[in-house]
Curated annotation (Swiss-Prot):
Originating gene: coaX
Cofactor: how bound: A monovalent cation. Ammonium or potassium.
Catalytic residue positions: 105 (proton acceptor)
InterPro entries hit by this protein: ATPase_NBD, Type_III_PanK
GO biological process: coenzyme A biosynthetic process
Name of the protein described by the UniProt record: Type III pantothenate kinase
Gene Ontology MF, one: ATP binding
Pfam families recorded: Pan_kinase
GO terms under cellular component: cytoplasm
Listed HAMAP family: Pantothen_kinase_3 (MF_01274)
Pathway(s) per entry: Cofactor biosynthesis; coenzyme A biosynthesis; CoA from (R)-pantothenate: step 1/5
């Protein structure tokens, strides 16, 4: 990566691709997102040439090929580094029995969270295609995590595997979770009076209940305050039902990628 040049960061998740172009000092020049499939293209035409691109990809080889083609079309021969989890990096220690098996998005998110909230014990909840929880001690030790079906996947699964329940997508479910429904669910107990609202509210509360349970359990086990950090595509819906304090951060993975890139550049003396 060229010294002093901006860096292109790419977070390829299961539902969409997020990207950001950042200065060497960390300030953001531009950012955007696109869905999977060829109909959407990133708005890179007006951007300066980066020194390199850094990719976290959990969406598979076809998405990796698409990203490589997009980069080659805009910036031929641009260096591309695809990250993977490791045992230790940027002040975070990975306690997975096989560290490389941890998803690169979760790894970058842990690094981003550790830097964003220094000296704090964290529970990181990410509401994407899957809902993931990560327990991160203040010293940077990632002790482990949980993976559950995401909010949208949970609703779709019920619709596809039952005879009479509707299949709700995120847009339809959001329309059912209006302000009064969310307020009632937060006050609790909440019981809906039609099937679509029963499904959307039930899946929302299932997500919130998992997070609240683990946040309380973690504080009981560690006997210290734990900050709950939330993010992801369904964060608005799930966070609206949470009854515990939480902090939203929408760019943990990209922030972690920036730190990984900066650390690698420092190692190389770039």
């Amino acid at each position: 990566m060229t010294s002093g040049a901006p860096c292109l960061l790419i977070d390829a998740g299961n539902s969409r691709i997020k990207w950001a172009l950042v200065q060497a000092g960390g300030s953001q020049i531009a950012s955007g997102a696109l869905t999977h499939g060829g109909e959407h293209q990133p708005d890179w035409l007006s951007l300066p040439t980066p020194g390199g691109a850094w990719l976290s990809n959990v969406a598979g080889e076809s998405v990796a090929r698409r990203i490589a083609a997009l980069l080659e079309a805009r910036w031929p021969q641009l260096p591309l580094t695809t990250i993977s989890a490791c045992a230790q990096q940027c002040g975070v220690t990975n306690s997975y029995t096989a560290p490389h098996m941890l998803g690169s998005d979760r790894w970058a998110g842990l690094i981003g969270a550790h830097a964003a909230f220094p000296g704090e014990h964290l529970l990181i909840a990410t509401f994407g295609t899957a809902t993931t929880l990560e327990a991160l001690r203040a010293d940077g030790c990632f002790v482990g995590g949980l993976i559950a079906p995401g909010w949208t996947l949970m609703m779709r699964s019920l619709g596809e595997h039952t005879a009479q329940l509707p299949t709700l997508d995120a847009s339809a479910a959001r329309g059912l979770l209006d302000g009064s429904t969310r307020d009632a669910a937060r006050r609790g107990p909440f019981f809906a009076t039609d099937t679509p609202r029963s499904l959307s509210a039930g899946c929302t509360l299932a997500q919130a209940g998992l997070v609240e349970r683990m946040w309380r359990d973690l504080q009981d086990e560690w006997q210290v305050p734990v900050r709950l950090v939330v993010s992801g595509g369904a964060v608005d819906e799930v966070a609206s039902a949470l009854k515990v304090p939480h902090t939203r951060h929408d760019s943990l993975v990209l922030s972690g990628l920036a730190l990984i890139a900066a650390g690698r550049a420092a190692e190389r003396g770039a």
